[in-house]
Amino acid sequence: MHALQKPHFLNLLFQRIIALLEIGLVCTICKLFEAADGTIAAILLLFLHRRTALIQMLKSLILWQSRFRVVVLFTGVIWILILLLPQLLSFAGLSRPDDSSFADQIQGDLAALVSILLKVWTTVAFGEEMLGRVFLIDRFEAVFKGIPGATALSVILASILFGLAHAYQGPSGVILAGTIGIILSVLYLQQKRSIWTNVVVHGMVDTVAMLLLFFGVKFL
């Protein structure tokens, strides 16, 4: 019995080590590039070679158009969170997330607004969802394979990393982004791991934010 279990244990251990190495490699590449282009390059190298993942992505691209109400609902929920959570965190003594870098870039500057929105819809939304949901959840599930609650634990850890990626906004920005990461992870799982619904929601949230900053509306 023990002889049969040993190869299984070693195989599981090997899978976990490989998953951790992939997570570390992707995070390192993203840090080096400091841009969504690096995120996409890393994810495509380490994830899209899997035939089943590519097929699932193509199927979900075809089907996402029927999910308009879901997009509206989750975009609304995230914006309610954006408006309320910083206020609650301020009561706990945390400063509000710092969005001054974006505000200074695009307020009243139509060319800058268009440039940022093009990035949002071509690389940022797709790249962050590929990393924050598709890749990290998949790899953490490989790390915790066979452990009860593996998916929930994977969502939490992936969302923590997603929050830390927004550390430039300060502690409250990390908490806000991490909480949004959990909501987007719930959407990803609820949509049977469709990335495209997430991409549209992510893009809509960022688009509204950029438009508000362009018109000088302070929302954080």
Regions flagged by a language model, labelled:
Residues 12, 16-24, 38-39, 71-83, ...:
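Alpha-helical transmembrane spans of integral membrane proteins, capturing the lipid-embedded, hydrophobic core
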Residues 30-32, 42-46, 106-108, 173, ...:
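Short secondary-structure boundary micro-motifs
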Residues 5-13, 60-72, 106-110, 114, ...:
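Hydrophobic, aromatic-rich alpha-helical transmembrane segments
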Residues 1-70, 80, 211-220:
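N-terminal, membrane-interfacial amphipathic/helix-forming hydrophobic leader that caps
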Residues 56-124, 142-143, 147, 219-220:
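Juxtamembrane helix-loop-helix connectors linking adjacent transmembrane helices
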Residues 112-220:
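Transmembrane helix-loop-helix hairpins at the membrane interface
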Residues 48-51, 99-108, 164-168, 193:
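Short, exposed beta-strand "edge-strand" segments with a Pro/Gly-rich flavor and a Y/T-containing core
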Residues 6-11, 24, 86-89, 97-102, ...:
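Generic detector of short, locally flexible boundary/turn motifs and exposed helical patches
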